[in-house]
Amino acid sequence: MRALSQDYYIALCTELIEHDRRYYVLDRPTISDYSYDMKMRELQKIEAQHPEWKVPWSPTIYLGDRPSGQFPVVPHSHPMVSIANVYSLEELEEFFSRTEKLLGYFPTYSLELKIDGIAVAIRYENRTFAQALSRGNGVKGEDITANVSTIRSLPMTLPQDAPEEVEVRGEVFLSYQAFEKLNICQREQGKLEFANPRNAAGGTLKLLSSREAAKRNLDLSIYGLITNREEHSHFENLGLCAHWGFPIAGMPKQCRTKEEVIERIREVEGMRSRLPMAIDGVVVKVDSVAEQHRLGLTSKHYRWAIAYKYAPERAETILQDITVQVGKTGILTPVAELTPVLLSGSRVSRASLYNEDEIEKKDIRIGDSVYVEKGGEIIPKIVGINLAKRSPDSKPWKMPSLCPMCHNPVIKERVSVRCTNPLCLGGMLEKICFFASKGALNIDHLGEKVIAKLFEMGLIRSCSDVFALTENDLKQVPGFKDRSVHNLLASIAGAKEVTLDRFLTALSIPFVGSSGAIALADHFGTLDKVMKASLDELLSIEGIGQKVAASIIDFFSKTENVEEICRMQELGVRILPKQVDRWAPLQGKIFVLTGTLQEMTRLQAEERIRSLGGKISSSVSKNTYAVVVGREAGSKLKKAQELGVQVLEESDLLKILNQN
């Protein structure tokens, strides 16, 4: 049993805010909706028990979506709040009781499929499509008109019997078929695949190119008409929308009793696996618009609607084998190879096993009949074992003592197992993929699939080999024509001039990510100084601790790493030294950002501070110049106050940036 404390409460708030960021901003959630909702309920329960602990930035107060900073933010005509979730018939009964108590009678309900997509508000002027907004924070949303206009099922004009001004609410989604085609395209281009259709739809709506958005075949289902007229029911309004040409994929149905509601929920669950798009439940709405207006809404949810959510889809299949992959830093990761099974609209044949300890903890064995579930990740996970089907001859699985790629010994490091060979081919393939990726050197046309082909043909075996590729080499690659060869060689040539921080990131130094690389570049200015840095010099840098400093020294002490860097330079790679403008207005001043900014993203703020000579740190110390606080500022604000460090509101930071 976890001990309940205020520190745990704060940690839970922080965790949920991070999950909100991954879900709404990055479109790459790492937990399932069910897991998120269970954590949110735990938070609500703690706040009910300890109201004195409740912080003003609690995720129970605000509505999720944050602006990406790429599109104009526009106020909604009517609040666009979310719908509360329930996971059991008992909780649904509580909703019925609350509603009946407020109205004085049991109302008629309208039920619709809860399509797993992105909510949008769509407005028409003079019966012509005028604007589309994302949900945003419920009060304001981003203007995504250009991308929504690419949806083929969206009518551009309405018939003459429609009002001149119309606003509808709907869900933008990708069908399973469109999602599968999109991920095939992503794989072929060496790009990261989307975890699920919802993430893909969200990512598409945030594309800056509507031409690219059009290629992805988004779809739309309208679920509401904004109206003050109360003579029609919600169900009738959806009928009007259908008459005007709007797509209604939610299969609405009126239910006049609890029994009818429950029967419909079970009916939809039975057809769930046969639907062409992802759904995660059924939305239950009070059908009368007049009754909806009487019931109103809270700061986060409508009182007249509830979403009955189904448990995450899971499937049972056979664990045929456990293979081991080698990552870019040499870490061995076990992967479950499964008998292919259909799950959430796609065929699943692999599942994540994380590490040896996880396998041992769950006692997962080859040959087991296992339950797999898809959460927020591309690769599903094993959530259980059908022990009744386990063979009496099965044996516990053990991590190999030799690397499966190079057959050198491996060593155990806490929970991970690492190959001891720095030149391991498995690790090198992953290292080259990262080296060329968007987060490192960003070499266009050199995706994972192309790198795998080059590696398989023996044309590359190290990162420096990328810069040695010739026209004749590339013409040997199957499917590579003159234009492909020209484009890739041009991209490689362009990558030969690289900033110090990006080059350091691309080297895959253990424990050194992009922020650590920026800190090193800011402090030392040149690669030569970084390579010769002492432990004390490294430890003096804000954000560099003992573990990271030791890793940097170890990396540059190895002959093979130094030789690799020298070869790159011989092949024409020019590492641009960090230019230090000693007259820059924020030169040397350390900033810490905490909370959510409203006028710009955190990344944009960090870039602007760095452009004026400032530095970014993740922790507050006596050396911090200022802590910039946004919405839901956390423990860093408290630490700044304790140390007497200057605290700036976002408006204060904007004044400083705009003045310079």
From Swiss-Prot:
InterPro entries assigned to the protein according to its UniProt record, in alphabetical order: BRCT_dom, BRCT_dom_sf, DisA/LigA_HHH, DNA_ligase, DNA_ligase_AS, DNA_ligase_CS, DNAligase_adenylation, DNAligase_N
GO biological process, one term: DNA replication
Molecular-function annotations in GO: DNA binding; DNA ligase (NAD+) activity; metal ion binding
Segments forming domain BRCT: 581-660
SUPFAM superfamilies in UniProt: BRCT domain (SSF52113), DNA ligase/mRNA capping enzyme, catalytic domain (SSF56091), Nucleic acid-binding proteins (SSF50249), RuvA domain 2-like (SSF47781)
Catalytic activity, as annotated: NAD(+) + (deoxyribonucleotide)n-3'-hydroxyl + 5'-phospho-(deoxyribonucleotide)m = (deoxyribonucleotide)n+m + AMP + beta-nicotinamide D-nucleotide
Enzyme class label: ligase
Keyword line: DNA damage, DNA repair, DNA replication, Ligase, Magnesium, Manganese, Metal-binding, NAD, Zinc
Pfam families from the UniProt entry: BRCT (PF00533), DNA_ligase_aden (PF01653), DNA_ligase_OB (PF03120), HHH_2 (PF12826)
Active-site positions on this chain: 114
Residue sites binding NAD(+) per the record: 33-37, 82-83, 112, 135, 171, 285, 309
Protein name: DNA ligase
